[in-house]
Amino acid sequence: MTVLEAQRKSLNLAALRDPSRPVSRIADDLLPYLQVLVDEFAPRQVILFGSYAYGNPDEHSDVDLLIVKDIIQSAYEDAVAIRMRWAPLMKRGRLFSFDLLIEPPEEHEARLRGGAFYREINERGVSLA
């Protein structure tokens, strides 16, 4: 087993399909996107936050994801790479609007210590991977 394989996360399907959480309503449609994210981009952690995690989503709600991963180029370029890889899924599956926050582990730890927004994500969000 390589180091990358050892670090690779698997999806938390129980959390994704938990009927007490709003995300369960879109779980089957969201799963292909999350599988690509986990399999191809090796995040250390993926946390769903916002209305699909702990709110009251409607047809205009986006899917908010905090992705903790080693940054390959920049957070922006990594987000573009993820979205480009998701493009074929959007053509044949359900179209989602995603809000991606991507940060390296060190930055994430610092933000948890210093910001209420990130603490709320960590405490109330749904850990998907």
Model-predicted segments: where are they?
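Glycine-rich beta-strand-to-loop/alpha-helix junction loops that act as flexible
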Residues: F49-S51
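Catalytic core of pol beta-like nucleotidyltransferases
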Residues: M1-Q45, Y54-E59, K69-A129
